[in-house]
């Protein structure tokens, strides 16, 4: 069936037809031990192996009939004329918070001299080292240039970009262009802005249900489409309750078809940074879950009536609640690491709960999470196992690394 909308995602498990990835690039080689925390990394992946792993991930998707798009290509295709190109460069520099006037001018000249659009996009993703710029005479240096003289970057890299799930989220026929938790990652949403404003296929053709100019934060790892009627959102380290309220009002007002939202409130820390690091849907009636969140988890049911949100805390068993809202007889929660506390902690850290479902009961996983994978297989799920020894160093799994653009309806 040919879709009339360029974005069509009404479930987490419908057969995946089209997906957007980002192949890790030079931004990974601009990670430094001294600045890992600033850039939201715990370790430095080996780029060559990370690219091989990512290419194998993309090929595994193609083998299942999925069309693979790349963020870097879509962004490059969105720079359709010189005016848009220069506007993009100026916004990029402005959002990078470059304060020295001479530095700003040198960066602009460097970027304007890159004539190929894809090369330009990849350079903006990689970041700019001060050593790449011409030496600024002391007489032209501003106070900022002098104070930050030991910091090696004129513009920081964006090493988290291969986690394409977070800067924006596809919801039904719409898109949530997110305002992200950290300044480091919020710059990533600029590419989505240009894709959904200027791209020949997507520009101006997709309803916006959240805008990056909002002041409260939300990330795509906390936005899950459970069915054509029900969304799940996480109140997490990276997503505010206030953002969720804004998102939901917009979704309901634009009549995208959703009738209810389940808001999950859970521990606020890096280990559980998004809902999809602890909870993903793998079949009509099955979910992965990290057992450590179950005790403190609170779930709120949100509906929209008479131009207002109606919020009610849900009591009782999570599996029963999910079954009721999905219209199935019973839901099974499959615990990451099984009943072993050590295995659960280790495999959740390595994204054992962060699965990408490409059809009902067909799931992409990291091969390293052997205990969780064995449990999933024992439940009748088909697993597509990928290597992720380098990719996982960024603390994200197959769902984190993918943004569906089109799924078949269930």
From Swiss-Prot:
It holds the Pfam family ADI. GO terms for cellular component: cytoplasm. GO terms for molecular function: arginine deiminase activity. Disulfide bonds: none annotated. SUPFAM superfamilies: Pentein. The active site is at 400 (amidino-cysteine intermediate). It catalyses: L-arginine + H2O = L-citrulline + NH4(+). Its EC number is 3.5.3.6. InterPro entries: Arg_deiminase. It comes from the Bacteria. Keywords: Arginine metabolism, Cytoplasm, Hydrolase. One of its GO terms (biological process) is arginine deiminase pathway. It is found in: Cytoplasm. The keyword Hydrolase applies. Pathway: Amino-acid degradation; L-arginine degradation via ADI pathway; carbamoyl phosphate from L-arginine: step 1/2. Belongs to the arginine deiminase family. PANTHER family: ARGININE DEIMINASE (PTHR47271:SF2). NCBIfam families: arcA, PRK01388.1. This is Arginine deiminase. The lineage of its organism: Bacteria, Bacillati, Bacillota, Bacilli, Lactobacillales.
